[in-house]
């Protein structure tokens, strides 16, 4: 079983165990498992891990390309030429990686079917599809509140007595949330259900960021229901 190390460490602090050694860690983990009884979840398959590695590598290449592009703006002469060559190489690597990701999805009967379902929703492309399949195997197996909390797009209350703080999202699976964010930027333009939901929030006076996070939640809820039911995009029939 794999558990969130932050949860275990917070549990240790809550029980007054501030020291940290291998032996103490083992005791804390045992006490955590006994007290909290986290729900066991299956480890990703070898294929899912391989797909996840490709998704991670793609993100690394994107970050490298962004960094090199920023350096190029200030470079001159031979250095700029070297950066141009490296940027071209990174573009080729990204193209090859995208083809490899597409091949992995198309050559797997299970993934091919799931990918077809997910990509039937406007705004959902190959990168979000591969990310969800590799890093969110619980998609379609949890209810809409549970999947939103797992990804980290469910706002949490911060209230105390008469004081009411702003609701904020926190925790969750950062890599999934980052790709979902980019997909939602597309969905608010191209997906009728997400676009109308986003626009209603804007018209009600919500800030762009608040409306966008809520739209991320909306898109994830739709994809969770589609995966659960094994059905392609049918806005009128999909429910949480």
Question: What residues fall within each predicted segment?
Answer:
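Hydrophobic (often cysteine-bearing) scaffold residues that line and stabilize catalytic clefts
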Residues: 93, 124, 176, 211-212
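Phosphate-backbone recognition surface of nucleic-acid-processing proteins
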Residues: 126, 131-204, 208, 235, ...
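Basic, amphipathic alpha-helical segments enriched in Lys/Arg and hydrophobic/aromatic residues
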Residues: 204-240
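Long, charge-rich intrinsically disordered scaffolds of nucleic-acid metabolism proteins
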Residues: 2-120, 131
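Charged, alpha-helix-enriched surfaces in structured cytosolic catalytic cores
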Residues: 24, 49, 56, 127, ...
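Conserved NTP-handling cores and scaffolds of large molecular machines
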Residues: 33-40, 65, 140, 154-155, ...
């Amino acid at each position: 079983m794999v558990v969130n190390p932050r949860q275990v460490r917070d549990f240790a602090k809550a029980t007054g165990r501030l020291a940290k050694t291998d032996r103490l860690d083992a005791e804390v983990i045992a006490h955590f498992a006994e007290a909290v009884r986290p729900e066991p979840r299956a480890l990703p398959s070898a294929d899912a891990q391989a797909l996840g590695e490709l998704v991670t590598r793609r993100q690394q290449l994107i970050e490298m390309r962004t960094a090199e592009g920023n350096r190029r703006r200030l470079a001159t002469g031979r250095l700029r030429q070297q950066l141009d060559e490296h940027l071209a190489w990174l573009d080729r690597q990204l193209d090859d990686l995208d083809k490899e990701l597409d091949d992995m999805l198309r050559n797997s009967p299970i993934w091919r079917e799931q990918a077809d379902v997910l990509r039937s929703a406007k705004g959902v492309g190959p990168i979000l599809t591969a990310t969800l399949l590799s890093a969110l195997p619980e998609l379609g197996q949890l209810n809409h509140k549970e999947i939103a909390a797992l990804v980290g797009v469910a706002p949490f209350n911060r209230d105390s007595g008469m004081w009411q703080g702003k609701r904020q999202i926190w925790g969750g699976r950062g890599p999934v949330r980052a790709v979902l964010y980019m997909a939602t930027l597309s969905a608010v333009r191209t997906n009728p259900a997400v676009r109308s939901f986003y626009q209603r929030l804007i018209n009600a006076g919500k800030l762009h960021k608040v409306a966008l996070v809520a739209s991320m939640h909306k898109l994830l809820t739709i994809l969770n229901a589609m995966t659960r039911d094994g059905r392609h995009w049918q806005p009128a029939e999909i429910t949480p």
